[in-house]
């Protein structure tokens, strides 16, 4: 099996990249692809860049040229579930755009024209993530809806909009729905596994920039455990 792994920022992929053997690097269309092995599993690690367009471009190249069997989106996310704290893990059951609105044409809020309202994560990959979590002592995780938009959600107004329109949301970030939609169009199974870098409505002693390396470490550990179970 070949596993595609996608992170937006250098900080989100560095730990995984450093664990790769026989690593080959290709730069294309503003994206960086690292192909090799992690724990004897064939992987292609993509550093896509931030935001939905960058993620869609990178995922398209990944799926078309490298043809992984499955895709794991890793990195950081902002927590919306009240039980989440910094460093906790979120696992997607489904992914939606929170900044898409073509309701004037009869679509649901968050649904892009011609696309499903939600992109369902692969059941086997979700179960794999749960099994990986069992091997991570003292790591709290929540499984549910992750919402994506081309904005860092930091205002009370935007948080309220998301909560009102997507009441089951557990986390938000800036790439997953683009990755999910691209995987949907390529019929490639996906799951999103991210670590919480900040939490809505909770004061944190650490800023996003300060906590990002720790979130990257936590999400990378999840991916390592999943790759061990894939073999």
Swiss-Prot record:
Q: Which gene encodes it?
A: mtnN
Q: Which InterPro entries match?
A: MTA_SAH_Nsdase (IPR010049), Nucleoside_phosphorylase_d (IPR000845), Nucleoside_phosphorylase_sf (IPR035994)
Give the function comment from the record: Catalyzes the irreversible cleavage of the glycosidic bond in both 5'-methylthioadenosine (MTA) and S-adenosylhomocysteine (SAH/AdoHcy) to adenine and the corresponding thioribose, 5'-methylthioribose and S-ribosylhomocysteine, respectively. Also cleaves 5'-deoxyadenosine, a toxic by-product of radical S-adenosylmethionine (SAM) enzymes, into 5-deoxyribose and adenine.
Task: List the Gene Ontology MF annotations in alphabetical order.
Answer: adenosylhomocysteine nucleosidase activity; methylthioadenosine nucleosidase activity
**Protein name, entry field:** 5'-methylthioadenosine/S-adenosylhomocysteine nucleosidase
PANTHER family associated with the record: 5'-METHYLTHIOADENOSINE/S-ADENOSYLHOMOCYSTEINE NUCLEOSIDASE (PTHR46832), 5'-METHYLTHIOADENOSINE_S-ADENOSYLHOMOCYSTEINE NUCLEOSIDASE (PTHR46832:SF1)
**Keyword line:** Amino-acid biosynthesis, Hydrolase, Methionine biosynthesis
Which Pfam families does this entry report, sorted A to Z? PNP_UDP_1
Active site feature: 12, 198
Q: Which CDD domains would you find in this protein's record?
A: MTAN
Q: Where does substrate bind?
A: 78, 153, 174-175
What EC number(s) would the UniProt record show? 3.2.2.9
